Amino acid sequence: TFHTRKTNELQIAIVDEAHRLRKKSGMFQNQGEDQIKEIINASIFSVFFIDRNQRVTFNDAGTIDKIRNFAQEQNSLIYEGVLESQFRCNGSDGYLAWLDNVLQIAETANYDGFEGDYDFKIFDNPHEMYDAIKAKNKINNKSRVLAGYCWDWPKEGRMTSLVKDIQIPEHNFGISWNLGNSDTYAIDPDSINEAGCIHTTQGLEFEYVGVIIGDDLRYENGKLIVDINKRAKTDQSIKGIKKLLKENPEEAQQIANEIVKNTYRTLMTRGQKGCYIYCTNKELSNYFKLAYNHQLSYTYNEPQVILSEQPLAADKTNSNIDKLNLKLDK
């Protein structure tokens, strides 16, 4: 943390994953000022690496606009650049662009598929996906199963993979969340018996990943549905959204939409050579199949978010945009 640093105390500060910066420092986020402001103040030269599509918790507060604003407040010179090349997902820019479009994170030209040798598969049975990942993992222990945070992670049983936290009853499938010693998840051979969550696997890379997409992302009546209610009660990443909903519904809907979609984008880009997916929602699985097999018509639209069971009193936007159902329990 930088809240105790003096002005220009550091020659240079290099901040990776700057999108994960918080509004304040400390365990309870109650110390100092905004972390971006503190870093700029404490450093003669600050470098921020940021990916706006990797915001996965309510408390992630790092944005390009905030960096610009705080830098301007301190009369700093601002230099902006874009990292054009990337090595993630076998260097497949096409896969990343396609994924952004199919998740409706960004409008790209790859709405109907992608070129290249990235190994992407959609499974109708979680057992079959798991078997495929285990077969890959036998080669060099570099493949893992990951999952959206739609299943609780109770304190009891966190140190044994015999407790199957993630249950898909229709397939009689179960797997435990990653154990409490998550620091070794990427290298421990026993981790193949566990499913990694977003908080454990963000920043990690494997050769192959199998991703279980839960009911917080569905496809219904031709619409992508984001449903925060389907997130686990033990998920701290959405803590604060209900309060914000009362204060600023528009901002709450935007953040909820980002968290769910960015979570799956992050999980689905952890595999260097391939990504296999299983969707608990069959319609979403079919949607992915159509998009992957070049059979999906161009339907990208900016999302509208419905925050309750009742329709909005007055729709002042174009009504032909996607509806993302973010129903929040009381």
Residue ranges and their predicted role:
Residues 57, 61, 79-94, 106-219:
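Conserved helicase/translocase motor-coupling segment
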Residues 45-47, 191-300:
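C-terminal accessory regions
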Residues 69-80, 165-178, 295-303, 310:
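Structural alpha-beta junctions
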Residues 298-330:
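Acidic, low-complexity intrinsically disordered tails
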Residues 27-31, 56-69, 97-100, 158-174, ...:
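Short secondary-structure boundary/capping segments
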Residues 1-136, 141:
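Conserved P-loop NTPase catalytic core
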Residues 23-28, 188, 251-254:
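Short, flexible loop segments at the rims of nucleotide/cofactor-binding pockets, characterized by
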